[in-house]
Amino acid sequence: AYFDCRHSKRRTASAVFYEMDYESRLIALRDRINNRTYQTGKSVCFVVTRPRYREVFAASFEDRIVHHYIALRLTPLFEEIFSERTFNCRKGKGQLYGINTLKEDIRQCSNNYTEDCHIMKLDLKGFFMSIDKKLLSEMVDRFIVRYYKGEDIDDLRYLCRVVILHSPEKNCERHSPLSYWEKLDKNKSLFTNGEGKGVAIGNLFAQIFANFLLNTLDWFIENEGIKHHGRYVDDFY
């Protein structure tokens, strides 16, 4: 998990600092997990302005290690239940795969471009900010109990609860002008969204658990007999 985390962050100041004594720090992290005293650290919060204003949280380097630990164990299990029509954050899928799938769907529905066809584009409004963290935590925990066979199952269940139920807005540094938050709707920010609601955009686990949460929607669409459909995070057709 550490090396996966370091792979794309090695030149950052936080990664360099951690690497200076990474063995001791990883042992200390392991001990806190074993003792059930692990707590998420301070996040960095900022607002991106393009293509639209959006609040983003960046977890500390050590917390990212924990996220990778979770992803390494759950992603292979999630892959076994995901629809082939889910494109984001999956090996062999992604944006280009989704675009090509849509092109092929159009070709088939239009009888090789000889007939008109129609596309219904949808998205889940305020999806990440509307997630009930307690519900998500319970769903993930039930999934782990049912499908995960590793000896570290108790550690995995514990870390998932801590990560999902964490409220990063209560311990963060803002790196954007406060005026940027005034441009956000109240349901677009964890600071004003309401207790127990919302998952921070910007963290690895947010994308992974979003796919897990919406997997039910994907299979509902397929079970309704809709052959041509696809989803990328909370946008789908």
Region spans (language model):
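Non-catalytic, well-ordered alpha-helical scaffold segments
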Residues: 23, 27, 59, 63-72, ...
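Non-catalytic, polymerase-adjacent accessory regions of viral genome-replication enzymes
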Residues: 1-27, 228
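Active-site-proximal segment of RNA-dependent polymerases
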Residues: 71-132
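N-terminal accessory alpha/beta regions
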Residues: 17-36, 46, 60
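Short, compositionally biased low-complexity segments
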Residues: 1-8, 40-45, 71-77, 110, ...
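Conserved polymerase palm-domain catalytic core
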Residues: 111-233, 237
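Short, conserved non-catalytic motifs in the polymerase core
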Residues: 8-16, 41-65, 81-93, 167, ...
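Generic hydrophobic/packing signal
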Residues: 33, 50-52, 69, 73-78, ...
